[in-house]
């Protein structure tokens, strides 16, 4: 099972959503079958940097390195060898914090190491057939310049989107026009990469991918990539198209814009499990993702834990928290809703967990922090939410 990540910007909550949802599918497969399963988290870090993201420092540094592979662009945060590596590490750090099990794959690494070489040769052998699939979907002007292969310019280091003038299948080379001068390059070892739709199909082919989910905006790409992988001799993976996350204004969440709530913000306000629940719910429905939605999701999570106590095995399998907790549903009794807890913070002016617990114990006797770990965490989150939102006159209902 594969998940994809385009590291042109910092990882956002939608990126996490793919891994979380795919992990839930893996968990279900393990209970249903004895098939070996693995999640591949693939980073398209050899893509050229098309534009400077809004939410990074040293924009002028990135401006000077536009069109280079992301792993050849300097890191504006000055922590890693490249911008691509920085964003890859941010993704891995987050996924590791959630204890996801995955196998990280770097496009740059697989191209440059030669891992993709044999698959690239298959693409070259089927060059004409692939062009016949792609060209009818393009405008007349784009048809004149399109090529499945994108050479890396030996002078500028840019990923070149230019037409290929000639191919040599026996020597595994392509010939292209570089500012009026014909240049030839091997398709092997990272000297070029593939255009997106062809690259996606080649990746499925090379990595033997059986399943991949993708955003609604990639449905047309998936259709073409499916035609390509069938052309080159393998079965396409099963797919699932999910609706996109929107910010408060109803705009698509973008890695480069950094709009909507961030991963770190959600985890500041609520538990990882509540975020996983949000990912589970209604994947075919476009959902706004902003700060006020957090408390509602937490309350949904608490309600589902309560319902699980009285459910039989079949009903439990249909309960989202079974998937959120990889079948190990917690048994804790819920003391009050998160919304009620937030209101208690506001009315009591509690400024610490200890003080808020005192008010909670007035509401419900004979309870302790030790016996209620989920609620104890909620008390801490409530204090955080209070000082970042309630004090700013934002209302939770």
PLM regions: where:
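Active-site cores that bind ATP or allylic diphosphates and position pyrophosphate for catalysis
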Residues: 96, 100-263
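Conserved adenylation A10 loop of the ANL superfamily
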Residues: 12, 157-159, 271, 388
């Amino acid at each position: 099972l594969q998940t994809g990540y385009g590291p042109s910007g910092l990882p956002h909550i939608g990126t996490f959503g793919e891994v979380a949802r795919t992990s839930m599918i893996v968990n279900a497969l393990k209970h249903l079958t004895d098939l070996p399963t693995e999640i591949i988290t693939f980073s398209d870090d050899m893509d050229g940097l098309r534009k400077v993201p809004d939410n990074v420092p040293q924009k002028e540094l990135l401006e000077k390195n536009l069109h280079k592979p992301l792993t050849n662009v300097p890191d504006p945060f000055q922590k890693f060898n490249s911008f691509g590596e920085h964003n890859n590490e941010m993704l891995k750090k987050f996924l590791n914090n959630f204890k996801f099990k995955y196998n990280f794959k770097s496009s740059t690494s697989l191209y440059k190491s030669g891992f993709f070489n044999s698959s690239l040769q298959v693409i070259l052998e089927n060059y004409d057939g692939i062009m016949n699939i792609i060209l009818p979907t393009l405008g007349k002007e784009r048809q004149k310049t399109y090529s499945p292969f994108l050479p890396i310019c030996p002078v500028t280091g840019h990923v070149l989107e230019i037409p290929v003038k000639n191919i040599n299948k026996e020597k595994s080379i392509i010939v292209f026009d570089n500012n009026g001068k014909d240049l030839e390059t091997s398709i092997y070892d990272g000297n070029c990469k593939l255009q997106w739709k062809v690259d996606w199909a080649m990746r499925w082919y090379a990595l033997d991918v059986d399943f991949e989910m993708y955003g609604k905006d990639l449905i047309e790409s998936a259709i073409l990539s499916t035609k390509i992988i069938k052309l080159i001799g393998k079965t396409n993976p099963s797919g699932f198209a999910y609706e996109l996350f929107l910010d408060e204004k109803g705009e698509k969440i973008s890695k480069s814009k950094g709009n909507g709530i961030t991963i770190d913000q959600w985890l500041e306000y609520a538990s990882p499990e509540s975020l996983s629940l949000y990912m589970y719910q209604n994947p075919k429905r476009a959902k706004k993702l902003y700060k006020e939605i957090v408390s509602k999701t937490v309350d949904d999570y608490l309600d589902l834990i309560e319902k699980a106590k009285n459910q039989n095995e079949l009903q439990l399998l249909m309960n989202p928290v079974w998937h959120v907790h990889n079948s190990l549903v917690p048994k804790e009794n819920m003391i009050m809703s998160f919304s009620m807890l937030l209101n208690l913070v506001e009315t009591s002016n509690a400024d610490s967990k200890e003080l808020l617990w005192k008010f909670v114990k007035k509401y419900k006797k004979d309870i302790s922090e030790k016996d209620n770990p989920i609620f104890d965490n909620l008390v801490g989150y409530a204090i955080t939410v209070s000082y970042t939102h309630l004090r700013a006159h934002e209302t939770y209902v």
